[in-house]
């Protein structure tokens, strides 16, 4: 019988700070991703009062061979028993809007680069396409004011930015339904995770003091956080270097404000 802590998939990191490393992702990681997914998709069609099930339809151009496509799109959508639109072809703004319209897509994950291309090709898309969008997540780079305004005014959604990485995905972001986005911020720690800004010694930095974004091995309930990867494939030294005590470092520098952003 498969166990939660057994490896499910080997995903290589992007290698932005060195050679790509193979991160072993366990089966339990899907559960660890769900709170961020639900928040970034504005509850993904679940009302909590009027409806007990979701009617969401998901689409993203993110490839299903990496963390973004698997953990931010495909697997969470299937976990909730909802359809996800698949397309094996090159992205284009026309294709994107055609798929959104044809399949009545309600929720999506779109990169800022894709949104910029869509904005350039179709400044006023609802003049040509019937859109049913209710929520959208974006990640990979800063969305920026122009794209944020385009999503709000032309697509009819407040885009939720998200931050994570292959090893510990979906840890910080926004949820326009329950907390507003702040300019220049990537959001708050998603429910369940202990996310902090720490110094070189693993101590939590005071408000406004720069440090490394990190996630604690144990969640807010004191249980092992299921979001964590198992380690790097055949690279124990790199796995050890990822941690300071029970904190797993992202390698990204940030500051925290008094409201937790």
Regions found by a protein language model. Give the residues of each.
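Short Gly/Pro-enriched turn/cap motifs at secondary-structure boundaries
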Residues: 2, 184-189, 204, 242-246
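Conserved S/T- and glycine-rich ATP-binding loop of Class I adenylate-forming
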Residues: 7, 13-16, 58, 100, ...
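Conserved G/P- and acidic residue-centered "switch" motifs that form tight phosphate/ATP-binding loops
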Residues: 16, 81, 140, 164, ...
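Conserved ATP-binding/catalytic segment of the ANL
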Residues: 214-261
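Conserved AMP-binding A3 loop
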Residues: 8-35
């Amino acid at each position: 019988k498969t166990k939660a802590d057994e490896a499910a998939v080997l995903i290589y990191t992007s290698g932005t700070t060195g050679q790509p490393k193979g991160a072993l992702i366990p089966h339990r990681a899907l559960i660890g991703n769900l709170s961020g997914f639900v928040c970034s998709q504005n509850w993904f069609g679940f009302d909590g009062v009027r409806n007990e099930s979701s009617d969401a339809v998901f689409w993203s151009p993110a490839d299903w061979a990496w963390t973004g496509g698997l953990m931010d799109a495909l697997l969470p959508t299937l976990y909730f028993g909802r359809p996800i639109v698949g397309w094996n072809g090159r992205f284009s703004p026309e294709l994107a809007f055609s798929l959104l319209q044809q399949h009545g897509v309600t929720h999506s994950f779109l990169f800022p680069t894709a949104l910029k291309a869509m904005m350039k090709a179709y400044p006023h898309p609802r003049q040509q396409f019937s859109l049913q969008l209710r929520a959208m997540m974006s990640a990979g780079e800063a969305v920026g004011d122009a794209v944020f305004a385009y999503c709000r005014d032309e697509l009819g959604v407040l885009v939720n930015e998200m931050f994570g990485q292959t090893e510990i995905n979906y840890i910080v972001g926004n949820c326009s339904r329950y907390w507003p986005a702040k300019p220049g911020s990537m959001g708050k720690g998603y429910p369940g995770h202990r996310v902090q800004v720490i110094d070189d010694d693993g101590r939590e930095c005071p408000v406004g003091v720069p440090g490394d974004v990190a996630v604690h091995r144990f969640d807010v309930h004191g249980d092992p956080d299921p979001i964590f990867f198992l380690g790097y494939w055949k690279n124990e030294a790199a796995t050890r270097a990822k941690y300071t005590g029970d904190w797993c470092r992202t390698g990204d520098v940030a500051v925290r404000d008094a409201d937790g952003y």
